[in-house]
A protein has these predicted regions:
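Hydrophobic small-molecule pocket/channel-lining residues, especially in calycin-type beta-barrels
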Residues: 13-173
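N-terminal amphipathic/basic-hydrophobic helices that include classical n-h-c signal peptides
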Residues: 1-15
Length: 173
């Protein structure tokens, strides 16, 4: 058994698969694979802005889905801001599903499109624990161009309509 290498978040993972080893259903998501890092900015209601650093890993694990892990922290003081883990799954040509768990007490299921290195997803379900942040909807856009990846997240909460929440620019490690 081969030794696993740590990824950007410190967990051990298999060496990156080559395009010929990928499950054929993942061809449209292959641009995501790898470890990414960079910075972003965000906006919390009622208008407080913040800057953050972010590390993201998209990993092929042998089945027709991509394992996803994200973590971010404040550029001001290094304190953790957010984590999320889950999977991206192809659901047919040009269609992708996202299943995520967030430590703020929510799970997210989203469906969307993938085309020419752009993924657009909208939540179809957001489930909350009794003490969760009152998130009601999420919309994501991920765009990959070579070794650059950009993220945008729009979020709605109880009493707050869907609006831009965070955006980041990442480079492949």
């Amino acid at each position: 058994m081969e030794a696993r290498q740590p990824n950007a978040t410190g967990s051990a993972r298999r060496p990156m698969a080559t395009p010929s080893e990928l499950h054929p259903d993942l061809a449209e998501l292959a641009f995501l694979l790898g470890d990414w890092s960079g910075t972003g900015e965000g906006l919390w209601p009622p208008g407080e802005t913040f800057d953050y650093a972010e590390e993201v890993t998209f990993e092929y694990v042998g089945d027709p889905f991509v394992l996803y892990s994200e973590r971010s922290w404040s550029l001001d003081d290094g304190s953790p801001i957010h984590f999320e883990n889950g999977f991206q799954r192809p659901a047919g040509p040009g269609v992708v599903e996202l299943v995520l768990a967030h430590p703020i007490g929510i799970t997210e299921v989203a469906v969307g499109t993938v085309r020419d290195g752009v993924i657009e997803l909208s939540s179809t379900a957001v489930s909350l624990t009794p003490t969760a942040s009152p998130v009601t909807a999420l919309r994501r856009r991920i765009e990959g161009r070579g070794d650059e990846l950009s993220f945008e997240l729009h979020m709605a909460m109880e009493g707050v309509e869907l609006r831009w929440h965070v955006g980041s620019k990442l480079t492949r490690a």
